[in-house]
Amino acid sequence: STGSLGLDLALGVGGLPRGRIVEIFGPESSGKTTLCLETIAQCQKNGGVCAFIDAENAFDPIYARKLGVKVEELMVSQPDTGEQALEICDMLVRSGGVDMVVIDSVAALVPKAEIEGDMGDSHVGLQARLMSQALRKLTGHIKKTNTLVVFINQIRMKIGVMFGSPETTTGGNALKFYASVRLDIRRGLQIKKGDDVIGNETKVKVIKNKVAPPFRQAEFDILYGEGVSWEGELIDL
């Protein structure tokens, strides 16, 4: 379960599918990490073991705890390079002892050559190559051990696009291809209590779904310091 009733319904299988790769993408502070932490909390409630690969070095245990995550039981890794992050992910998946792995985020998976190189060096296509190699390897292991792997991704703007959407996700096309489910998450209107902003309306579109019909949508409220508002969703449903 994702912690959101509406999104679980939109996904068609009651939540994120196991043994699959899922991509959650959207603009900054749209609720991507919150949604992942909610899913981790639900997984842990059902006795699952979860891991969080924090490539962005932005994991906040206090916030995670507020969302119901058992931080003591969560495996958190802060790798130095993209290669290391994906190796750790592969190792966790192959072990068969983990139910869910979250990678936050694809944009922060910087190849070793780029980290060790100089600022002005050109590293065109390195990250895309790294992703496609890693995903080719990962897919088989994920299927065998029935692990859920979630990649959080950011949105970038393509330059000079005249027609169609100028938005694209980072890390090349491999993830689009290998992901069984792709979620596009957007922040909507602010939720106010008097003059104070207490949260945001959030819209999630299921852009790709290989396990149920795609293109369904869900809307829910994310309240600051609390996460997805269950009560609001029950009233809406």
Curated annotation (Swiss-Prot):
CDD domains in alphabetical order: RecA
Entry keywords, A to Z: ATP-binding, Cytoplasm, DNA damage, DNA recombination, DNA repair, DNA-binding, Nucleotide-binding, SOS response
Major localization listed first in the record, in broad terms: cytoplasm
SMART domains from the UniProt entry: AAA (SM00382)
UniProt cross-references to Pfam families, sorted A to Z: RecA
Compartments (UniProt record): Cytoplasm
Protein's UniProt keywords contain DNA repair: yes
Gene Ontology CC terms: cytosol
Gene Ontology MF, one: ATP hydrolysis activity
Keyword Isomerase attached: no
Biological process according to GO: DNA recombination; DNA repair; SOS response
Binding positions for ATP per the UniProt entry: G26, P27, E28, S29, S30, G31, K32, T33
Function: Can catalyze the hydrolysis of ATP in the presence of single-stranded DNA, the ATP-dependent uptake of single-stranded DNA by duplex DNA, and the ATP-dependent hybridization of homologous single-stranded DNAs. It interacts with LexA causing its activation and leading to its autocatalytic cleavage.
UniProt cross-references to NCBIfam families, sorted A to Z: tigrfam_recA
Family affiliation: Belongs to the RecA family.
Protein name: Protein RecA
Source species of the chain: Neisseria elongata subsp. glycolytica
Taxonomy of the source species: Bacteria, Pseudomonadati, Pseudomonadota, Betaproteobacteria, Neisseriales
Gene of this entry: recA
